[in-house]
């Protein structure tokens, strides 16, 4: 019996020690679980958009294809500022076969035309020259396929007179309904 009293006393002592560390009320408080930490990325900083200053714009104009420069692959380019002197050269019938070819006016127009052809990118010279020649032919005497064949020959002669070689690229991505010409 003494053993039982000693055991109960030890239990009471252990219980009182536990109650003094757990808040003093004699009961244990349930453990408080914090939610897992929430990860928040650091704030993302975007610098303010700056408009380019006028002096920062490129000074070179974008390179245009002959379709963009001359419209419909050169057809309809009679008013084109790029080969306007060639139009005049053809309009005055200044060609090796024509009699006024040796006139001073034809020689001046030829020089100006050659200068303008040299300004066209080499890959696009044939398309540009052909388009101007064809348009000139069609305005004078619309002959369809025959005019197209003659225009090809004259375009080659014209560039040869200027001392230039032609590079004949593939067809221009224009359609015939828009007045385009397939070579």
Swiss-Prot record:
Cited InterPro entries: Bifun_inhib/LTP/seed_sf, Bifunc_inhib/LTP/seed_store, Glia_glutenin, Glutelin
Main location: other
Pfam families from the UniProt entry: Gliadin (PF13016)
Subcellular location: Vacuole, Aleurone grain
UniProt signal peptide: 1-19
GO cellular component: aleurone grain; vacuole
GO molecular function (one): nutrient reservoir activity
UniProt keyword terms in alphabetical order: Repeat, Seed storage protein, Signal, Storage protein, Vacuole
Function: Zeins are major seed storage proteins.
Assembly notes: Interacts with OP10 (via N-terminus).
Name under which the protein is recorded: 16 kDa gamma-zein
Lineage of origin: Eukaryota, Viridiplantae, Streptophyta, Embryophyta, Tracheophyta
């Amino acid at each position: 019996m003494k053993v039982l009293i000693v055991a109960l006393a030890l239990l009471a002592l252990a219980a009182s020690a536990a109650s003094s560390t757990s808040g003093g009320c004699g009961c244990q408080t349930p453990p408080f679980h914090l939610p897992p930490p929430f990860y928040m990325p650091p704030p993302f900083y975007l610098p303010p958009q700056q408009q380019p200053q006028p002096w920062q714009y490129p000074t070179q104009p974008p390179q245009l294809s002959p379709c963009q420069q001359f419209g419909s692959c050169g057809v309809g380019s009679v008013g084109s500022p790029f080969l306007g002197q060639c139009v005049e050269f053809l309009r005055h019938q200044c060609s090796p076969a024509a009699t006024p070819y040796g006139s001073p006016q034809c020689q001046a127009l030829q020089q100006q035309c050659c200068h303008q052809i040299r300004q066209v990118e080499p890959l696009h010279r044939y398309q540009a020259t052909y388009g101007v020649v064809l348009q000139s032919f069609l305005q004078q005497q619309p002959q369809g396929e025959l005019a197209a064949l003659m225009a090809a020959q004259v375009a080659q002669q014209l560039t040869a007179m200027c001392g230039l070689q032609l590079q004949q690229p593939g067809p221009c991505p224009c359609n015939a309904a828009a007045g385009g010409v397939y070579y």
